[in-house]
Amino acid sequence: MGAETQPAEPGVRDLAEVDEPAFTGLAQRHRRELHVHCYRMLGSFEDAEDTVQETFLRAWRRRETFAGRSTFRAWLYRIATNACLDLLAKCRPEPATGGEVRWLQPYPDRLLDELPAAGADEPETVAVARETIELAYLVAVQHLAPRPRAVLILRDVLGWPAKEVAELLGDSVNSVNSALQRARAGMREHLPAQRQDWTGDETDTRTRELVRRFTDAAVAKDVGALAAMLRDDVRCSMPPTPGLQIGRDAVVSDWIADGFESLGSLRAVPTAVNRQPAVAFYLWQDSDGAYLPLTVDALRVTGGAITEIVTFHADQFPRLGLPERLPADRTP
């Protein structure tokens, strides 16, 4: 894989005399990319938010240690990575049997759009930025031990040289290279063998049409039509709720057992998370006289079929910028 590229950073030499407002202004330029970095490390939007705040606090307190030997951006990444490792050392959750990552949270595309633009003339760079934020990648990377995880993200996603990663982690270059090989092997174990099976399709006309048909069938509660869009080995999960369903029959049986066909009136709003198509569903509530948030389905589409559905609970709607309610436009 190639690595993400970033625009050149204006020189920052001496932070000792910088006041807090000026320092905050410098740091805030990098907030979104640091947040995405912490999100890759932790798999949780909320934990990433807390860790970025901790990063800025540590950076302000240690500003006199910045000697200008690296860029200010690299210095912040160093602090952020160590803050993530500290958090994981305190309370590292273990993926459940079968590969579930119950703390996984979605990342809104509207916030990913705030990232500095990767080189449009470098297709591999653009692909890395997209693929390494998709949910399948996030789930796989959470299975790695924290330090190999950090090495993988710094080397393969951000493109840091092994020497700089070694300095950040206080390891030798040989140790970093060994950790990278272990991390890559772990990713191969937890990702499908074929790259297109875990990256999904680009959002092309065929994918958009499939998502539209999925949305229509879900609103109609047409289980047969939904089943026809699933690949035989489809995976379905709903973090943080336990339970990973694998295979079309298992997924459909779970829908039926959960009473999907007897739900009340539904409405849907298209959205996007983690550079994947998603659909937000709303359920009619008589007591409120409106459609209220139900779930968000993030879809992975490969070869014209749905290969994974990750369903998130209604508490994610505000972060995704989705409406709190939808008005009645017909008699439910």
Regions found by a protein language model. Give the residues of each.
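Hydrophobic-face residues of short alpha-helical interaction/recognition segments
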Residues: 34, 38, 76, 80-88
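Solvent-exposed, charged amphipathic helical/linker segments at domain boundaries
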Residues: 162-168, 173-267
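Conserved RNAP core-binding helix
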Residues: 35, 45-62, 77, 158
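Short, basic/polar amphipathic helix motif occurring as a linker/hinge flanking DNA-binding modules
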Residues: 88-109, 191-199
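A short pre-motif secondary-structure segment
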Residues: 151-152
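Sigma70-family region 2
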Residues: 17, 41-45, 54-72, 86-94, ...
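Low-complexity, glycine/alanine/valine/leucine- and proline-rich hydrophobic stretches
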Residues: 252-332
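A short, charge-rich alpha-helical start-of-domain segment used by transcription regulators
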Residues: 13-36, 46-49, 60
